[in-house]
Curated annotation (Swiss-Prot):
It comes from Homo sapiens (Human). GO terms for biological process: negative regulation of translational initiation; protein K63-linked ubiquitination; protein monoubiquitination; protein ubiquitination; rescue of stalled ribosome; ribosome-associated ubiquitin-dependent protein catabolic process. Residues 346-358, 418-431, 447-461, 502-513 have a biased composition (Low complexity). Belongs to the ZNF598/HEL2 family. It comes from the Eukaryota. This is E3 ubiquitin-protein ligase ZNF598. CDD domains: RING-HC_ZNF598. The gene is ZNF598. A zinc finger (RING-type) spans 29-69. Residues 312-469, 490-656 are annotated as: Disordered. Pathway: Protein modification; protein ubiquitination.
Amino acid sequence: MAAAGGAEGRRAALEAAAAAAPERGGGSCVLCCGDLEATALGRCDHPVCYRCSTKMRVLCEQRYCAVCREELRQVVFGKKLPAFATIPIHQLQHEKKYDIYFADGKVYALYRQLLQHECPRCPELPPFSLFGDLEQHMRRQHELFCCRLCLQHLQIFTYERKWYSRKDLARHRMQGDPDDTSHRGHPLCKFCDERYLDNDELLKHLRRDHYFCHFCDSDGAQDYYSDYAYLREHFREKHFLCEEGRCSTEQFTHAFRTEIDLKAHRTACHSRSRAEARQNRHIDLQFSYAPRHSRRNEGVVGGEDYEEVDRYSRQGRVARAGTRGAQQSRRGSWRYKREEEDREVAAAVRASVAAQQQEEARRSEDQEEGGRPKKEEAAARGPEDPRGPRRSPRTQGEGPGPKETSTNGPVSQEAFSVTGPAAPGCVGVPGALPPPSPKLKDEDFPSLSASTSSSCSTAATPGPVGLALPYAIPARGRSAFQEEDFPALVSSVPKPGTAPTSLVSAWNSSSSSKKVAQPPLSAQATGSGQPTRKAGKGSRGGRKGGPPFTQEEEEDGGPALQELLSTRPTGSVSSTLGLASIQPSKVGKKKKVGSEKPGTTLPQPPPATCPPGALQAPEAPASRAEGPVAVVVNGHTEGPAPARSAPKEPPGLPRPLGSFPCPTPQEDFPALGGPCPPRMPPPPGFSAVVLLKGTPPPPPPGLVPPISKPPPGFSGLLPSPHPACVPSPATTTTTKAPRLLPAPRAYLVPENFRERNLQLIQSIRDFLQSDEARFSEFKSHSGEFRQGLISAAQYYKSCRDLLGENFQKVFNELLVLLPDTAKQQELLSAHTDFCNREKPLSTKSKKNKKSAWQATTQQAGLDCRVCPTCQQVLAHGDASSHQALHAARDDDFPSLQAIARIIT
């Protein structure tokens, strides 16, 4: 009864305090926004719901106010609470572990219910005392599981936990819950194959248990490595790693961002260690040097002779023959008498100078008398040495050394050997001027090689006897060709712009992989290093003393071929030596081809009734077919050569590009330029091949490419008649004979070719509306036309289909920039045919009725012209520069005086 009375008294006191103070209950919680069924209040008087306060103090073990962060040692749970200072907390029910006071038993019951572990599927069962018991019950009875990661990291009440089946649990871990879009699953560490609560926990794990590059991390990269071995590889590849000495076992500190930092580290940390390692590799050996008398024995006077004058004068002649140890001891004693020796050395020098003056006076008297016995006597007597003769001790069997001198006068001639026999009266006297040298003979200088001709050797200028040249003068051997030995018939250096070059344009963008590169200059120049015989009598005479012909020389033609090589004019030495790669069978073939006489018959035009499909280039065999070519003599067309027995190809076959010739015999390319047939037989001595101007010389033997097959991608290309002479399908009714036009030559690049080509490409892209698929199709058609896979008419039609009416805007520039003269004529003919078909027949005037091959560029509506010399289609602005290029090629026709000078 007393206890009940005390409880009633506490309740009455609390109600009285609540009535006197304003109410703290009602409303919603500032944290969870839930109803304030029961309020938790601390000394800061900030009310929160009892759930949030219990979660903070019991589950999270945090005892501060969730509103103001003030540390709350005690809190009171109740439904209607006054100010905390007015509450008699010592009279309330108390939870000692968490310092929670309860206003009544109902609030305490709510608090205990929050912390109970009840099964959500079995409400009739009593609560479990531990969460592990509830988890075991759920797994056994209901086959439900809770997420271990959520259980470990999420501090929530038991009734708030989620239970999953096995399938749902796997989806929850990888993807998240369908009803909770804020959770996207638990991220996986690919190194450990373990999942973490969220990305923050995964990042903590990677930073704590794995490795990352601190250089890349400062730059914003998020790259991690499973162990340090992979990080070391990253340091070695992307940064600078020091692996010397102790740094090979260090981590992180031996990697550097820049090479300068690495060098500074090596200088500061490893320079001493490298010096120590080098010192450890040294082996200490005790040895001593013998006296150095070699320079004095050779008759050379140096500074050490004057330094050791007094030492030798004191030691005497006998002391110089002593042992090595005695000499070392005397040398040691000499060091301690430096001042005295200096004075004695000065006296010795003065004495030697006086003796030298006396010798010069005596020598002048002997020369005035001119008596030979006097000279011999003076030579036999020799100069009187004030110190006596100085000779180093010789071993047994050693011959007498050269004469020595201790003065600083001229060196005697005996110190230098002469290759020729010495004159009987030329004994050298020290200090005297050298006597007149005897006349040198050819026998005194035998040649070093028997095969070297006397005409090629360089005679040395006679000089004083005994004086040697500081360097050897190389004699011109029979294998050393000089440029002046071979005056050039044609300039060996091609003028820029005259030879066809590999052009970078829109035409070869799609077929660049199928081109064949010309031989590099390094391969051409290797021919100049091969030995050949020199022309003239010296070559024959030198051949007698040389080795006999080898088998290779006999296969190459023997002396006759070598003589041909030596007598023909060449443009350079490398082109002469490049002829060694020609086999005898090829030479015979060339002679046979060169002996053919040009005919006078004109080539018959192909039948005018050929179907349009004949313009398609079929796959032809790899063997070359020769077409009728006009003979050009002194620049005038006399008529084509008779057609050979090769099968005649259908008209319209495209011709291979001039920039990429196949390796063919040299007669196919005459020296005077232009597509000429084989000429008249050359004069004697000129039967060898004459290289084309601007054509690289053939490679040396062993480097000749096979001539049986054309380059890849050109197997279907055969030479064809000029397209201007082939009637098109639109002119099958014409009866006029076509006039003969000059054959197209190599394409000459116009001015600003690259800029104009880029502008053309951009224009085509704009007309195609930057459609890459259509632009790729255009490039594909262009490449097929350049390779001869489609005809000009087909290519023209495909371009019109792609560009429509805009094709006429770019066709003029497209035609001018096409780097192939033959293809230009084909495309121009196709354009003319199209224009003729578009015009009605009734509107044509009679004077303009011409065949398609006679149509001009003005009639076709083009702003261009055709060069009458090379048949290249030009813009009007390029005509002057193009004619200048033709004028620069006038050296293709050398003067007859130059040829006569070379022959004689």
